[in-house]
């Protein structure tokens, strides 16, 4: 997908294996509850802008996870098919998260290749 840096499935596998990626599932809570990539934090795309602008303590309280830092290198956003992941990546980059990337293959590819 054009418009934002992407990560491929082999690259994502490598980042996850090394523990260097922060993974964000931007699908709805219902979609994520039905299955997601292990280790992903679910923040629906509709909440993402406010989430990324929260104080770290508020983010921690709401999502039970550390808020990403602007300088974090490997912030990977994904959805079901790629569109919301792209939207989320563009949003994060516009807020100064320069390491934000879209897993363009999305959960659909993960499910096909990893299940």
UniProtKB/Swiss-Prot annotation:
Its EC number is 2.8.1.3. The active site is at 79 (cysteine persulfide intermediate). GO terms for biological process: sulfide oxidation, using sulfide:quinone oxidoreductase. Changing residue 79 to A/S: Leads to the loss of catalytic activity. Highly expressed in kidney, liver and skeletal muscle. Lower levels of expression in heart, colon, thymus, spleen, placenta and lung. Weakly expressed in brain, small intestine and peripheral blood leukocytes. No expression in the cell lines EFO-27 and HeLa, or the normal breast tissue cell lines MCF-10A and H184A1. It is found in: Cytoplasm, Perinuclear region. It comes from the Eukaryota. GO terms for cellular component: cytoplasm; cytoplasmic ribonucleoprotein granule; cytosol; perinuclear region of cytoplasm. It holds the Pfam family Rhodanese. Its main location: cytoplasm. It catalyses: thiosulfate + glutathione = S-sulfanylglutathione + sulfite + H(+); thiosulfate + 2 glutathione = glutathione disulfide + hydrogen sulfide + sulfite + 2 H(+). InterPro entries: Rhodanese-like_dom, Rhodanese-like_dom_sf, TSTD1_mml. GO terms for molecular function: thiosulfate-thiol sulfurtransferase activity. Thiosulfate:glutathione sulfurtransferase (TST) required to produce S-sulfanylglutathione (GSS(-)), a central intermediate in hydrogen sulfide metabolism. Provides the link between the first step in mammalian H(2)S metabolism performed by the sulfide:quinone oxidoreductase (SQOR) which catalyzes the conversion of H(2)S to thiosulfate, and the sulfur dioxygenase (SDO) which uses GSS(-) as substrate. The thermodynamic coupling of the irreversible SDO and reversible TST reactions provides a model for the physiologically relevant reaction with thiosulfate as the sulfane donor. This is Thiosulfate:glutathione sulfurtransferase. It comes from Homo sapiens.
């Amino acid at each position: 997908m054009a418009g934002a840096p992407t990560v491929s499935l082999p690259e994502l596998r490598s980042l996850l294996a090394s523990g260097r990626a922060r993974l964000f599932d931007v699908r709805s809570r219902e979609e994520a509850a039905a299955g997601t990539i292990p280790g992903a934090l679910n923040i629906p795309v509709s909440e993402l802008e406010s989430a990324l602008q929260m104080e770290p303590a508020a983010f921690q309280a709401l999502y039970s996870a550390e808020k990403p830092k602007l300088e974090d290198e490997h912030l990977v956003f994904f959805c079901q098919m790629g569109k919301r992941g792209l939207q989320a990546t563009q949003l994060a980059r516009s807020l100064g998260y320069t390491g934000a990337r879209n897993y363009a293959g999305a959960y659909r590819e993960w499910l096909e290749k990893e299940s």
